[in-house]
Amino acid sequence: SAHADARIRVHALNSLNQFIQIGSPSMSANMDAYVAVLFQRATDERPIVRKFVCKALVYVLSTWPEKLAPDMNSVVEYMLYSTQDSDEDVALEAAEFWLQFAEEPRLSEQLRPNLPRIIPVLLKCMVYSELSLLMMGDIQDDAAEPDRPEDIRPRHYGGTMHRSERDDEAQGSGHKSRAAIDADFDDDDEWDDDELDDDLDDEAGSWNLRKCCAAALDVLAMQFRHEILPDLLPLLKDRLFSDDWIQREAGILALGAIAEGCIEDMTPHLPTLIPLLVNMLRDPQPLVRSITCWTLGRYSSWCAGEAAEHQQQYFVPVLEGLLAMVLDNNKRVQEAGCSAFATLEEEVGPALAPFLAPVLRALVMAFDKYHQKNMLILY
């Protein structure tokens, strides 16, 4: 791992990581020495080496968390720094650390005092990067454009916060072949047109830094519940009322991410937040409308309250707003609107009966408007 050739350093780290994953007794016996080596390589000049250092620390945390306990303050400092690395591959591997950290109940006492520093970093990294926006291309009205064949592929809808995407990604990310690692060293080479097209197509559905940080915030909310709110709510307020739509979008994403873990403690704020979110459905930016649909879906259990006054004040505007998004002129928003409406429908159950007329009108209009991909969701 100290070899002059960065390729050799990466291959060494990658090889040793496999022994961590299987809980090798020989690796356990030498773990202190290995952790010391990781600290030596933590400031390596090559981003790909730092990426594998972060990956190794995540593996150690998941397999032998007690080995990191004595140096946890230093590890936290390093991971906070690396989560904000200019190289997104490094940042993503570092962000995985917070996801693993939050899912490890044995470390909750060590994680708790660091929440005021971790939460702002996660929120910062949930903002769309310029590269992500560039790779998504034109995100304006596209409902009249026919679907491309590559657009029609399986996607995960609803359920736990991005967990299925992360699990799918993780199944193939544990071990990298020598050829795959060597290819990573050629990132500065020019892409051919087909490779670039593939990357553009995969951007929206791929596991990335933004989704990883949102998932980490979700798990932190499940683990610590009301304890995260004093640090999070002031930051959310700033973002939700920001003039910059990218900041607003990230704030709405964060609000949805904490829904499952903090629903009881967020309840006093929802009479203000739900109307605000309904208003966000009229935002000129499709990505804001799309994420607002998702977040409203996350709070659908509260919106579907049984009291008639509650339903008139909150449920009806949410239902009308989501049906409008089902008929939006942007395909991404249509998709999010359908998914959120399906979630709301499940929460309401038979109580939806009085509203069937507008629901059916919207769905019939959607059948006339949708192309093949969103038609599958509509069914």
What role is predicted for each listed range?
Residues 1-379:
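Karyopherin-beta/Importin-beta family HEAT-repeat alpha-solenoid scaffold
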